[in-house]
């Protein structure tokens, strides 16, 4: 222990680096592990140690049916320049269009095989919908063949969080509960629907409504009817790889909607989320259903005592409930959107969702907004969340009062166009022509910024440098570009969409691994999912990816899952990946696989 009461030099560290004179890092050939459409731009980026002065030709090899290889292109790699701590060269093989199996080679480095094919993106979203989202379903027993992923978790949700309390994982309760429940009291009705937010097990409302809206966008644009999962909410049971006659995407939309509806039914407004009461549960590794005893806490019982389906053990999760108008708006945007998708699959839930959305919108207009904020659990910027709600309500109801709100909020949205542009574009068909025309300057400015960002590194996407790596930023940028390309094709080209997807799939600094587990020849196999204790992965999960360790080291650990900033699955990125994979197949000129 360090001595107490001392000032000045108290401890000195002597660090002796263990280095190998003349060591050179082997080249990395960054490329899409999934492959490329025949007509697409195809660029591989070769990452070299800055002290590597050797030169070698880059080669593209075609793999025959018998495993033999034939060189189809040999060319000197074109120097791009230096970025971070490495030097970069590139091989453009866009002229190779013949479908088949290929590998890239530079010196002694050879990549895993990848495809050139018309349908290269067609099934890229299947693992995410087939496996990742079912495994993430809270309040359900999830089974896959002979494997139980987890039991019916959190049957004892949830207790009212204590007042004036700053909690773990960026949750906090303000000076009031804004509910009829006292701190520590059980709030009934919350043990239904929703997904584990990330590698851990909380229900973060902001993530829930982001996922619902993204899944609805996918449904409305492409209508994927894929059915490989059976969901029985009455039995609270999910069976992976067992069709049940209902499109899986609609089932996931319903599952998220159930949790959002439950919050309004329970307390009258959206809550921040539901999270474990202490650090011991927060660090829980294993089956989510073993985190708690599943029995509602009864303070009249002794610790460990169980009676009448209740328990004296206060292990129930806490609900953080201080009102935030931003969360209300974000949630009703998702409910309004979900009501469109669920009209046939569950008309009663669709009516309930839309009823809540219209009622809460009207209520919010009668008072000053509730502005409670803490961490990243109380919603996005208020005007952005309100704009999203207005857009979704307009799309659902066609009521002109929501068009008026959209128009009134547009100047604020224009100032943060990158954050709001997909909502802004979604409203175009329901707004006057002047609305679209007024958007053009912002679209041009955004397109110009995209070009500038693409030139900043050899991968052509914005690479973040914070403590959470940037896969989410890259996917969001690609979806932004897709929305603008479809609405303003003369201003925004499709290239940024492809660059974003290729970054996720292996065209990035540090390695050539796909950041979508199970998608691409080599993908993330050690990740921060709810099975991270096994040093394993969940197919279809998307990790944050490349973290830039200060000052210049691009890192993604494949040997240690617990670096959450590099390896933690989060549900919004999963939903966005499903959306982006569909967009890519659309741009490739072939309809996505159903």
Task: Give the residues covered by each predicted segment.
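Beta-strand-rich recognition/accessory modules
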Residues: 1-21, 584
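Carboxylate/His-rich catalytic cores and anion/metal-binding grooves
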Residues: 247-271
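Internal metal/ion-chelating core segments
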Residues: 322, 332-336, 341, 348-385, ...
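Solenoid-like repeat scaffolds
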Residues: 410-416
